[in-house]
């Protein structure tokens, strides 16, 4: 039986539902716990999506190990106040309580949980890939972030969530697009409107910026300029494979972007610092398969969420 490792960026699962819940577009759920009625709306819907991932891969006959990565307040925010300043929908105390409950339930159900002060889920995901990719036959990252595509390989794929999805409204499964080394170039070139190559996503964001995270990049450097830059690198026979390493991206920027001037080099390197995943040590805890039907039942039935057990 092939062993599949699912690495899940939790934050988007919660974000996906919270706006609909607050707008009254989702049915409110509750149950009695120790004689007290508890609102389980914010707990149930993210867990429902989460468990659907496990069920899908198990239905294909895979042995599934799951790791869930949670955001903490990022050190990057202290380095640059504009970083992710465009993110709306700030969480309140009710949200934080729900997220903590979800994390506890996932842990009790036997899943691998990762969270580290000052680090984002992306940092933890990157470290899990670097350390444990070879422990499994294949790894799938569930994320909305294109940054993670620098880790695509023969053994790593991505299920990328995009708001609105590719199918019917509300159809969660169809709002994830499978991205692999085989379809990356076509998929991202269509999104970014330029000739993007495998392993060049970090270089692109360092030069052109990343609007989703409020990272500016080089002033005036857009998709057309990136195409010209790639043509220049092609002529030089550049090895794009090494650009999975931020250190190699930095070296290339220092060697090849100087024609735009010292300011452009500084802007690109500053953007790279914000994009680069930070080193972490928390994931030294090796991901193992420890979940079971019995553990899920014990965890989820505290809140009478029977549909999540099987």
Language-model features and meaning:
Residues 2, 56-70, 85-91, 111-112, ...:
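Non-catalytic nucleic-acid-binding/docking modules located in mid-to-C-terminal regions
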Residues 2-138, 152-175, 276-281, 291:
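Noncatalytic, basic helical substrate-engagement surface that gates or grips nucleic-acid strands
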Residues 8, 144, 221:
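Single, functionally critical "micro-switch" positions that shape active/binding sites
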Residues 123, 149-150, 227-228:
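Alpha-helical elements of the RecA-like P-loop NTPase motor core of helicases
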Residues 139-145:
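Conserved RecA-like ASCE P-loop NTPase motor core of nucleic-acid helicases/translocases
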Residues 146-147, 153:
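Acidic, divalent-metal-coordinating active-site segment for phosphoryl/phosphodiester hydrolysis
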């Amino acid at each position: 039986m092939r062993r599949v490792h699912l690495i899940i960026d939790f934050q988007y699962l919660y974000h996906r539902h919270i706006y609909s819940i607050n707008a009254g577009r989702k049915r409110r759920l509750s149950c009695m716990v120790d004689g007290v009625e508890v609102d389980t709306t914010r707990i149930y819907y993210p867990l429902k999506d989460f468990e659907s991932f496990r069920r899908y891969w198990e239905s294909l006959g895979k042995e599934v190990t799951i790791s869930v990565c949670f955001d903490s307040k990022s050190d990057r925010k202290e380095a640059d106040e504009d970083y992710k300043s465009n993110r709306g929908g700030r969480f309140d105390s009710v949200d934080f309580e729900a997220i903590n409950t979800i994390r506890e339930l996932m842990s009790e159900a036997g899943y691998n949980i990762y969270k580290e002060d000052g680090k984002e889920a992306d940092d933890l995901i990157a470290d899990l890939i670097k350390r444990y990719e070879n422990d499994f036959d294949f790894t799938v990252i569930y994320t909305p972030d294109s940054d993670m595509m620098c880790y695509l390989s023969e053994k790593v794929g991505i299920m990328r969530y995009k708001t609105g999805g590719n199918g019917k409204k509300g159809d969660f499964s169809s709002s994830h697009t499978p991205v692999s080394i085989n379809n990356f170039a076509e998929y991202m070139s269509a999104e970014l409107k330029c000739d993007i190559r495998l392993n060049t996503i970090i270089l692109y964001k360092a030069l052109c910026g990343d609007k989703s995270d409020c990272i500016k990049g080089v002033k005036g450097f857009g998709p057309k300029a990136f195409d010209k830059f790639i043509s220049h690198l092609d002529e030089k026979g550049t090895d794009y494979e090494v650009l999975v390493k931020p250190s190699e991206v930095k070296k290339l920027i220092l060697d090849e972007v100087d024609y735009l001037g010292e300011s452009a080099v500084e802007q690109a390197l500053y953007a790279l610092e914000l994009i680069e995943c930070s080193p972490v040590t928390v994931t030294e805890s090796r991901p193992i398969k420890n979940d079971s039907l019995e553990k899920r039942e014990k965890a989820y039935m505290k809140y009478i969420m029977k549909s999540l057990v099987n």
